[in-house]
């Protein structure tokens, strides 16, 4: 978080990749992968950001994963992919995530 706050995205990316490589815990790995994907998205590395989301294994993060994937796909111009991701988030998310997914679907 500190590197992102300082807009040192390269250091943030390296730290998160290291955390993913060293973690034996699916929840920690999933959280680090979500943050890594967000950092890569921030830098315009859309394909890398989508690839990082493949490391999210914990089911508890599936809606957050789908919401972020949808945002990345929108930025890439993949409206159909974004729609599918947001619809998946609606199926697996908590009430707030479902509402957010619906808002994003409405904005497509």
Language model features by range: what are they?
Residues 1-63, 69-72:
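Alpha-helical adaptor scaffolds
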Residues 57-59, 73-96, 106:
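TPR/TPR-like (Sel1-like) alpha-helical repeat modules
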């Amino acid at each position: 978080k500190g590197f992102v706050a300082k807009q040192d995205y390269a250091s943030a990316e390296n730290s998160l990749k290291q955390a993913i490589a060293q973690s034996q815990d699916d929840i920690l790995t999933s959280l680090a992968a979500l943050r890594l994907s967000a950092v890569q998205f921030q830098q315009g590395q859309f394909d890398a950001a989508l690839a990082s989301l493949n490391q999210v294994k914990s089911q508890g993060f599936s809606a957050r994963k789908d919401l972020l994937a949808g945002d990345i796909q929108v930025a890439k111009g993949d409206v159909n992919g974004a729609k599918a991701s947001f619809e998946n988030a609606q199926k697996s998310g908590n009430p707030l995530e479902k509402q957010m997914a619906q808002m994003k679907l409405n904005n497509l």
